[in-house]
């Protein structure tokens, strides 16, 4: 069950990601359980969980990072976007298989908050078009919290809303913000020459030249 205490507003050291982060994963967007959008109103992009066997350091829980979308297939104005992701079994739904569910957020330049709450208490999250099959590169930059069971879907939705704001504030710090820069420009906040080009191109090289800090 979720602890009844205030949440930290940011997570991870201000100086930037510390070991084992950043962790890179990739894969095509696949169909998940279909509950994120339909039942919770929180669209997610699922990628295969196969790579988790290569990352024993990733325990079940909620993380934040950035995703790089293939600009040849997906146009949002920006192709590197902040993200919150869940790795695990989602105790509320009692899943039997481990999954990677990624909620892609608006650019940091977009007005906060990521999710809005109406006068009647309805929470609405940022939505993106369906893009099943689209290659997706994921860079995990930090850990937010363990996964919890919940007494209601409303409690789950509220925690995800807070997760999004924690991720957003965490990524707004200079040592993290540069991970969202896909342009071939060095950012001193990322350590200058330590900002390197992603060499593992996907989809025939469509992502070649996307710049992440490593």
UniProtKB/Swiss-Prot annotation:
Keyword line: ATP-binding, Flavoprotein, FMN, Kinase, Magnesium, Metal-binding, Nucleotide-binding, Transferase, Zinc
Cofactor field: Zn(2+); Mg(2+)
UniProt keyword annotation of RNA-binding present: no
Pfam families: Flavokinase (PF01687)
InterPro entries xref list: Riboflavin_kinase, Riboflavin_kinase_bac/euk, Riboflavin_kinase_dom_sf
GO molecular function, one term: metal ion binding
The reaction(s) this protein catalyses: riboflavin + ATP = FMN + ADP + H(+)
GO cellular component: mitochondrion
EC number: 2.7.1.26
SMART domains: Flavokinase
Gene3D superfamilies: Riboflavin kinase-like
Cofactor binding note of this UniProt entry: Zinc or magnesium.
Function: Catalyzes the phosphorylation of riboflavin (vitamin B2) to form flavin mononucleotide (FMN) coenzyme.
Entry's family note: Belongs to the flavokinase family.
Name of the protein described by the UniProt record: Riboflavin kinase
Organism of this sequence: Aspergillus niger (strain ATCC MYA-4892 / CBS 513.88 / FGSC A1513)
